[in-house]
C-alpha cells in the first residue's frame, strides 16, 4: 500500500500494521497481516511482455514465453519428469481446473509442452472428503478455501507440485481482473473489499496455519502471486487495469526468512526502484526447491541451445 500517495493511487482502502515492524498491508488482509512474520514479501515483480494475462501466465509457470510455437513446460511437469512417483499419486496437480478463457487464445503455461503428454499435469477437483468441520472453517467455506484445503491434502499424500487457479476463467465474473467493465472484467474494488480479499485472506492464512500445525510448513514452499499488477491509478469505474511494470508476491514455508521484504517500488507503485524481480526467478526458485537441476535444463530451437529457465533462483528468500 501507498498510504501517502494521492487518493487516486491509494484507492479506498487504508493500510494497517503487520506483525513485522515497518511493513504494512491493506486493511482488507488483516489475517495475513498478523502472519507477516511468516511471509517473504516481494514488492518488485515485473515483466516487459505484452500486458495480457497469457504472457504473465507463461512467464510465471514456465519461466519464458513460447518461441515459434514451441510450448515450454509447466514447472511442475519438469519436476515430475525428474522425480520418482508414487502409485496413484499425481506428481503435478492443477486445482481445480486448467486455465481456460482468460482473454486471448494463447498458451497459458499449464501444459507439459515439449516434454510430451506423459508429463501433463493432472486436474484435481476441489471436492473435500474426510476433513473435520473445524479444519474446513479454518480455511473458510469458500471456493478458494476448499481449493487450498484440497491442495494440503494432495501435498500430505505425496504430490510434489500443486498449482491452484483461483479462477479458471475471467470474463463475466467477479475476479481479481477488476476493470469495472461489465463487458470483460466486471469486478471493482468494492468486490475486493466484500469478497475477494476476505476469501483470500482467510484461505491462505488457514493453509499456513494448517501446514504449520501438521509439521509440513518447513518442507512446503507456498507462493501466492498474480500474473501481473494493476494500474497505479484507480479508473473512473472504481477498478484498476492491467499493469506489468510492478506488483507484489508472497512466499512462505520452505524455511524462507519470514518478515523479509525483497525489492521496493516508487511512490505510486508504478515501477521497481530496488531489486526488480522477474517472474522467471520465481519459476526457477520453485524448480530448485523441488530438486530440479535448473542449470542443466536446456532445449534446442532452430539449432540453438537455450536454457529452459533463463533465470536464477531468488536466493534473497533465504537471507
Residue ranges and their predicted role:
Residues 1-319:
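Ligand-binding pockets and gating/stacking loops
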